[in-house]
């Protein structure tokens, strides 16, 4: 089968070796999928360190993976960045996988942003990363768009932005529209209207409030706030629950 062939080709390189999985902070399922891939597709033994925002997953992982824990091929741990650093640099660990931002990747591999002063990476083990990006949402300029289609796609985009308080790796971040598209203004107006109507969750992710503030400061009058601003009480509650940028 296709799965069998994947197991043959993948496990020969990594099979039986230890991989550290640094869990995602924005979605529960990502860490689970990463562990399953490394265990059953790549043939690795896995140590997963959960993101500080999602340490609640630890107890569930202990139950779900109990048979593999008893076999000695899986472990679930919690801790801060220091714990993560000790794990990835441990001599028994052969590879690393993480879901996070480029700053986290560079901190692990280079000890910070790569520069001419530090041409050699601190971590030379194989590492795979799923990093966030500025995901574009591209509109094809076609005169045949109907009002119904404009509304449908504007709401699709608005819901993608609102989902998970926009704290997803692939959340659309940039809308690309042809400057001469005759429906451009109508689409943007419909999108703004949809965003005003969708209830927004509290942006819980560490540091997101500061990023929003910097964005607004950078663009000045060109930045438009749509919907209600986060109340001071809600912002303080999010900061208390999840702390500053981790």
Label every model-predicted segment.
Residues 1-68, 72, 135:
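Conserved small-residue-rich beta-alpha loop and adjacent elements
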Residues 25-26, 100-103, 133:
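Short glycine-rich anion-binding loops that position phosphate/pyrophosphate groups of nucleotides
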Residues 37, 85-86:
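Alpha-helical segments flanking ligand/cofactor-binding loops in enzyme cores
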Residues 45, 65-69, 73, 83, ...:
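ALDH superfamily catalytic-core signature
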Residues 56, 78, 148-152:
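Conserved phosphate-coordination/catalytic loops
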């Amino acid at each position: 089968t296709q799965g069998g062939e994947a197991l043959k080709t993948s496990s020969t390189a990594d099979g039986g070796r230890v991989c550290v999985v640094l869990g995602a902070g924005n979605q529960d399922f990502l860490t689970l999928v990463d562990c399953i891939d490394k265990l059953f597709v790549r043939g690795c033994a896995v140590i997963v360190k959960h993101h500080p925002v999602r340490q609640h997953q630890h107890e569930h992982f202990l139950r779900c993976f109990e048979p593999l824990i008893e076999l000695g091929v899986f472990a679930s741990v919690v801790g801060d960045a220091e714990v993560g650093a000790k794990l990835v640099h441990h001599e028994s660990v052969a590879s690393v996988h993480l879901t996070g931002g480029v700053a986290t990747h560079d901190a692990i591999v280079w000890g910070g942003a790569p520069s001419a002063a530090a041409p050699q990476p601190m971590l030379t083990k194989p590492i795979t990363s799923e990093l966030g990006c500025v995901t574009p949402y591209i509109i094809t300029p076609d005169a045949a768009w109907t009002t119904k289609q404009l509304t449908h796609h504007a709401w699709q985009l608005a819901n993608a932005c609102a989902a998970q308080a926009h704290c997803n790796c692939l959340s659309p971040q940039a809308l690309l529209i042809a400057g001469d598209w005759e429906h451009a203004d109508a689409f943007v107006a419909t999108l703004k209207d949809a965003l005003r109507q969708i209830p927004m969750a509290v942006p819980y992710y560490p540091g997101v409030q500061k990023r929003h503030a910097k964005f607004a400061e950078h663009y000045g009058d060109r930045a438009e706030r749509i919907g209600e601003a986060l109340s001071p009480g809600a912002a303080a509650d999010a900061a208390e629950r999840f702390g500053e940028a981790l």
